[in-house]
Swiss-Prot record:
Biological processes annotated in GO: hexose transmembrane transport; transmembrane transport
Organism from which the protein derives: Candida albicans (strain SC5314 / ATCC MYA-2876)
Glycosylation sites: 4, 9
Name of protein: Major facilitator superfamily multidrug transporter NAG3
Subcellular localization, as worded in the UniProt entry: Cell membrane
Record family assignment: Belongs to the major facilitator superfamily. DHA1 family. Polyamines/proton antiporter (TC 2.A.1.2.16) subfamily.
Effect of disrupting the coding gene: Leads to increased susceptibility to cycloheximide, 4-nitroquinoline-N-oxide, and 1,10-phenanthroline, but not to actinomycin D, fluconazole, ketoconazole and colchicine. Also leads to attenuated virulence in mice.
A GO CC annotation given for this chain: plasma membrane
Membrane topology: Multi-pass membrane protein
Coiled coil: none
Primary gene name: NAG3
Keyword tags: Cell membrane, Glycoprotein, Membrane, Transmembrane, Transmembrane helix, Transport, Virulence
A Pfam family the protein falls into: MFS_1
């Protein structure tokens, strides 16, 4: 705001322009008024965007009438220390964050933000670790239970990953009603507790059921952590934080066979795989619950409005969340039906298929590496597990490159904004167009260097290219879906997660048979050819994506000439 004592032509809406003449002593009050005006406009914008998808607004609240508030239809109650605007027609008082609000998660100190980010990433790492650590020691539990290799894979790996796909359909919408922290507390507690019967199981049925429960409960943090990071980080800063988080789902499965292989060779029983996982998961659960607070803005503002109503006796305080009414049918439609409807969208379908191929590759490696190194070269489980390290190094290298691609995106997007245009969603595809080639290149290198007579180094170091490509594909794909579907992005991502998890759960059931029948070289080459064909997907959408969205009733597409 200018230092002049006269402020002319403050526009509070598109139709009315009001002249104000103020003295220096009134400047602070005017600044607060303008600040709250922006806050109301923000809430009104959210109401207008969310009304169509989140259910009808509480009557008689009229968002069209509120667009001219707080001037000239809004007053401030001087006795109210919160200084929230009062709507003269509806008498409601809109509760939103005030400037510099210390309770706003985005205003947390940077050190605390990074502490929360690291803990969120570690929880995600631990969850992903739980899906893979058991693959290092499958023969001993199969012998104990008297079941085949396929059955023990079904019980210990497949059921866990199926839970990954089912859980998000329930936990994501539930977190919008009760907040993220209660979901974290309850689901992680259930997940940690059910590791115990897995380790103590006396029959295969117990292991199968408990691993399914574990996978479902552990899916909650994998679903909610992205939202938690968005709660605490501003847009320009979020890219680096998301790079830390997004590496965790890949590093966890990579480290799983390493730890599992060591336990297989040196632990007295296979049950120590679960006891070790219990210790790690339990430790991070306690630290996480103690340190990380509730960050969901809607829930925090709802609690503030409730407290204000109680403290002041004024029932007019309302948060944005309280201006929504959603029936059970609406919630069920949003969380259970819409994701499957969106799978009929070409963009969602093809991106989902691509991500499913990548996810399947990750779980295929858990069984391909033992075939190549343990069966082919006679190595131990622990030595074989070390061969996964280059994949992890590739993932880390890709995450370090993420800020560069994020900076490039911001530069390209700003060029559109400078011309008064919206940046197209297809700008998100540029890293995919680069990263897509690394995966088939790494797979072909793995395939044709896996002969028994050749060095171990070929299959080992080819994993770097695959790991590097994974993250360059995963993050941009999610961003592309979000930018393409805007309000329906959560449902589109839920659909992707469900299909990806189901496919990832199925891959271990046929990988061993595929390698034994096709041979190490052609089995891996088959997946390499499939991933090579998928390279066309980002290029297809980069060229035709904007036009494809114009034919969709769900996708967002700017007007095209």
């Amino acid at each position: 705001m200018s230092d002049n004592t006269t402020l002319d032509n403050i526009s509070v809406n598109s139709e009315k322009v009001v002249d104000y003449t103020i003295h220096h002593d009134d400047r602070k009050e005017l600044e607060r008024l303008v600040s709250h005006n922006k806050g109301v406009e923000k809430i009104v914008s959210e109401l207008a965007e969310g009304a169509g998808q989140l259910g009808p607004l509480e009557q008689p609240y009229d968002i069209h009438k509120v667009e001219t508030h707080p001037d000239p239809h809004t007053d401030y109650n001087d006795a109210d220390p919160w200084k929230y605007p009062i709507d003269k027609e509806t008498k409601l008082r809109l509760v939103d964050w005030t400037e510099g609000d210390k309770h706003n998660p985005k205003n947390f100190g940077k050190g605390f933000k990074w502490l929360c980010t690291v803990l969120l990433g570690m929880i995600c790492f631990v969850v992903a670790l739980g899906s893979a650590i058991v693959t290092g020691d499958l023969e001993r539990p199969a012998a104990d239970f008297g079941v085949s290799e396929e059955v023990i894979i079904l019980a210990s790996v497949t059921m866990f990953v199926i839970g990954f796909g089912v859980g998000p359909l329930v936990f994501a919408p539930m977190s919008e009603e009760v907040g993220r922290k209660p979901i974290y507390v309850v689901t992680l507690f259930v997940a940690v507790v059910f590791i115990v019967p897995c380790g103590a199981a006396q029959n295969i049925a117990t292991l199968l059921i408990c691993r399914l429960i574990d996978g479902t409960a552990f899916s909650a943090p994998m679903t909610l952590i992205g939202g938690s990071l968005a709660d605490i980080w501003e847009g320009p800063e979020r890219g680096t934080a998301m790079a830390v988080f997004s590496a965790a789902p890949f590093l966890g499965p990579v480290c799983g066979p390493i730890f599992g292989g060591l336990l297989c060779d040196y632990a007295p029983t296979w049950r120590w795989v679960y006891w070790t996982f219990l210790i790690v998961a339990g430790f991070f659960y306690v630290v996480f619950i103690v340190v990380v607070p509730e960050t969901h803005h809607g829930i925090l503002l709802k609690k503030r409005a409730k407290k204000l109503r109680k403290d002041t006796g004024d029932s007019r305080y309302r948060s944005f969340n309280e201006l929504q009414i959603r029936t059970f049918a609406q919630v069920a439609k949003t969380s259970l039906l819409r994701p499957f409807v969106l799978l009929s969208e070409l963009i969602v379908f093809l991106v989902t298929m691509y991500m499913s191929v990548l996810y399947g590759l990750l779980y295929m490696f858990f069984f391909a590496y033992p075939i190549v190194y343990q069966e082919g070269k006679g190595w131990s489980a622990s030595k074989t597990g070390v061969m996964f390290i280059p994949i992890g190094v590739g993932v880390i290298a890709s995450s370090l490159a993420a800020p560069f691609f994020n900076k490039d995106y911001n530069r390209r997007a700003q060029e559109y904004r400078d011309r008064g245009e919206l940046p197209p969603a297809e700008l998100r595809l540029i890293p995919m167009m680069i990263g897509c080639w690394f995966v088939p290149a790494g797979l072909f290198a793995f395939a044709w260097s896996s002969y028994q007579r050749l060095s171990w180094a070929g299959p080992c170091f080819s994993g770097f290219a695959v790991g590097f490509g994974f993250l360059l594909l995963y993050n941009p794909a999610n961003n592309y879906i979000v930018d393409s579907y805007q309000h329906y992005a959560a449902s589109a991502l839920a659909a992707k997660t469900f299909v990806r998890s189901i496919w990832g759960a199925c891959v271990p059931l046929f990988t061993i048979q595929m390698y034994h029948r096709l041979g190490d070289e052609w089995a891996t080459s088959l997946m390499a050819f499939i991933s090579l064909a998928c390279c066309a997907i980002p290029y297809l959408f980069y060229i035709f994506g904007a036009r494809i969205r114009t034919f969709s009733k769900y996708a967002y597409a700017p007007n095209m000439d």
